Amino acid sequence: MSGWRKIYYKLLNLPLKLLVKSKVIPADPVTELGLDPSRPILYVLPYNSKADLLTLRAQCQAQDLPDPLIPLEIDGVQLPSHVFIDNGPRVFRYYAPKQESVKIFHDYLDLHRNNPELDIQMLPVSVMFGRSPGREGHGTPHLRVLNGVQKFFAVLWLGRDSFVRFSTTVSLRRMASEHGTDKTIAHKLARVARMHFSRQRLAAVGPSLPARQDLFKKLLTSKAIEKAVADEARTKKISHEKAQQNAITLMEEIAADFSYEAVRLSDRVLSWTWNRLYQGINVHNAERVRQLAQDGHEIVYVPCHRSHMDYLLLSYVLYHQGLVPPHIAAGINLNFWPAGPIFRRLGAFFIRRTFKGNKLYSTVFREYLGELFTRGYSVEYFVEGGRSRTGRLLEPKTGTLSMTIQAMLRGGSRPITLVPIYIGYEHVMEVGTYAKELRGATKEKESLLQMLRGLRKLRNLGQGYVNFGEPIPLTTYLNTNVPQWRDAIDPIEAQRPSWLTPAVNDLAGKIMVRINNAAAANAMNLCSTALLASRQRSLTREQLLEQLDCYLQLMRNVPYAKDVTVPDKTPEELLNHALNMNKFEVEKDNIGDIIILPREQAVLMTYYRNNIQHLLILPSLIASMVMYQRRITRAELLRQISMIYPMLKAELFLHYSKEQLPQTLDTLIDELARQQLICDKGSELVLNPARIRPLQLLAAGVRETLQRYAITLSLLSANPSINRGALEKESRIMAQRLSVLHGINAPEFFDKAVFSTLVGTLREEGYISDSGDAIQEHTLEVYNMLSALMTPEVKLTIESVSMPAETNNLLPEPEAEDKEEN
């Protein structure tokens, strides 16, 4: 580089250092993209901009990547280490220099032809200042590139809202080997790079925003809404104009009013807020979504719902991943001042709890959702319908998902892909309210006062987690499961083909399974799991560390799913972090520390334990069977677990099929034996007395679930003809009784949704006949197996209420030896 050029770059860099504070995407490009800083890198930028180049250089220096200003010298040939695909517009348009990108690509390909060992990494990089999509009909398109003067003002006003996006590298060695090294390949490289950057920019900025009233006018002209308006006028005996005004009023209630300026402002506020409330936001597998957006997919985000914070957190994360924040389906209960108008400007559109009895509303909402898809906006909705009060996933609500498939049946060209997302926290601000609601308190209506009270409590929230699960392309799903689905395409009328409901229910189940497949274990949910497993909710520091190590080894050595994230910290580091959250007490004596979960915190901590219960449920079940039965063959253990696995699968959205179960159990048994929690004697699995404590704590993870199953099965065995409603009600009553008598501090233990799922599974598995009567022989078999995994006291409480004398005669005699329950 010449001396004058160095001086020029230094002078230009001075204002950039003051004005530009760019984010890098992904956060760790070397690791996430597999870059090798020791190998030559050719940086590829979309168009000639020295501001972009110097912004890139600053990030390369921060990431320990080669300097894009220093030329590469290979085999005595010196070539620039960066290339601009296009020159971009000029201030003085009569001067248009020749494009050099094709020549530079050709020179690099020539080097690879002459040197078989050479392999240069071609690294596409885009630098963006601001991301305003613009309004429809307002002048220049949002994908335009800027000349020097425009770039100056962009840096001046938007330097703090800029990002540097690194993409996956392309091997020039592979290009040379597979496609050759002539000039046509160089032209092709430049053309493909140009398309890549154009798509990437569209994914970051999104389509132009419509004027709200123009959108309403367009919706009013849709055939479906015209028909619904006519029906409204006829059924309510009002004028057509009045019915049309009713439709517009509903559009005003529903529609978002997205504003880029509001997003920019909220990003600053949220960045400040997260940095003070959270110790970190952990994001995993975001590259999947970036790639989908770049490939032109219509993305529907379907996260689990833990907290009102979810709305803000996910939009914040997506914005920082270089993606457009989605339009979010929010409950109408959040449409209060000032939250409603703010959420609306950030992309929220509001949805009522039920559409029943209001055809005009359902039609307007369906058409609005379809219009969002048609225009290419990403959408987010919570498939659970509401926030989970227990920390587990709720049964999915399928209304909006059904409308998503109906939108495909309008004949839209863009492929729709569902992206399940796991959102987790070490502290959920509403968890105290959830516990009260589960105990019967009336849900408090959302309001400004409630919001201010909630904000007052926000402090020391630990870590947050956003894990993107495995996407579900709807076209692929329908092609596989409903090959004839295209026969139902109708651009005018909303279609409800016979296959729609079964397909939607199956899809909803797959979404929940994939959310759980992306769960995040953390210090809080691991420590809560261990302490709640102890009868006195307390463990010595050594015992707690031993149990944390047991959980971590299980999760690392036998991963539940490839997308599950497990902390890379030691048990000591996790415990120290959890103690800093001020949820636990530490009592010191002459021997050492005792970690105590206070009684008032115990109920709240079940929420965090339940976040990851599905990750440990099968090892807990194996541990329980070995602990209570002392010795058991692998075949018998598989037989017993196979009997209750369908109930666990339905309740916890487990991903293992019945066919995968034997191999999964064998792998888990081998790991438990490796940890010496059990002894594998070849023909039998035997209790290891030396490791009874961690085995008991592990087994306790399934204890309450098995007791709940035993309650329902004992009632069914005693009264096979009991109807579903009575069975669920009596099961809840008995569960409440059991929780009082035996100190079970878990509100979900008698949650009606859990019993409803259980009874539905029993029917599907054939324990309840088509006539509605239980098959006593089968229910008793499972109950007897479950009762062998409970203490005599718990078993006696259940049977004293549910079992008449004649049924008790069918039960096995209790063992003489009592086994302590922890």
Curated annotation (Swiss-Prot):
Catalytic activity: sn-glycerol 3-phosphate + an acyl-CoA = a 1-acyl-sn-glycero-3-phosphate + CoA
UniProt pathway: Phospholipid metabolism; CDP-diacylglycerol biosynthesis; CDP-diacylglycerol from sn-glycerol 3-phosphate: step 1/3
Keywords tagged on the record: Acyltransferase, Cell inner membrane, Cell membrane, Lipid biosynthesis, Lipid metabolism, Membrane, Phospholipid biosynthesis, Phospholipid metabolism, Transferase
Compartment(s) of residence: Cell inner membrane
Cited PANTHER family: DIHYDROXYACETONE PHOSPHATE ACYLTRANSFERASE, GLYCEROL-3-PHOSPHATE ACYLTRANSFERASE
NCBIfam families: plsB (TIGR03703), PRK04974.1 (NF003441)
Name of the protein this chain belongs to: Glycerol-3-phosphate acyltransferase
Species whose genome carries this gene: Yersinia enterocolitica serotype O:8 / biotype 1B (strain NCTC 13174 / 8081)
